[in-house]
């Protein structure tokens, strides 16, 4: 009898509450913080998409139009303009493959940290055949108690 009681208790406590099951068709709602930017223009700037996504994809999770200055990310379901807090990027720009740097951004209670690794770099001085540097990036976003880290890839240039 005690064994049956323990079995029933374990089944009750291992099943999600019915309200959570109904919220998303039987699954617990996602806690994803970083989404796809809704507004993306073509032209010079920095564009990053989730790692592994097709290179022709326009699903960017970070977008910075060189003419607008303030980058965009979709955080918690809405596009947010970020302001740069700090950067360890060399003043003259990245000079070699494998070089690392980071940037920190904020917008209200939203904090973003981006860690860059250069995958390909345009040789200096100006070379019209090389239009962008490519990077692998780790992006960590936090808003209040929520936090998410994603891997991304893309580049900066024209």
Locate each region found by the language model:
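Cysteine-centric segments in proteins
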Residues: 20-158
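N-terminal Sec signal peptide cleavage junction
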Residues: 16-18
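Bacterial N-terminal signal peptides
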Residues: 3-14
């Amino acid at each position: 009898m005690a064994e049956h009681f323990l079995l029933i208790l374990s089944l009750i406590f291992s099943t999600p509450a019915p309200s959570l099951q109904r919220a998303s068709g039987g699954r617990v709602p996602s806690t994803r913080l970083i989404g796809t930017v809704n507004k993306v223009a073509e032209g010079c700037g920095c564009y990053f998409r989730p790692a592994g996504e097709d290179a022709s994809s326009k699903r960017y999770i970070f977008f910075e139009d060189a003419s607008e200055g303030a980058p965009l990310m979709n955080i918690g379901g809405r596009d947010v303009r970020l302001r740069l807090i700090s950067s360890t990027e060399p003043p003259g720009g990245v000079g070699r493959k494998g070089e690392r740097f980071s940037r920190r951004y904020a917008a209200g209670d939203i904090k973003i940290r981006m860690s860059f690794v250069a995958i390909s770099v345009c040789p200096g001085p100006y070379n019209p055949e090389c239009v962008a540097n490519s990077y692998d990036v780790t992006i960590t976003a936090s808003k209040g108690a929520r936090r998410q880290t994603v891997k991304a890839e893309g580049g900066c240039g024209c």
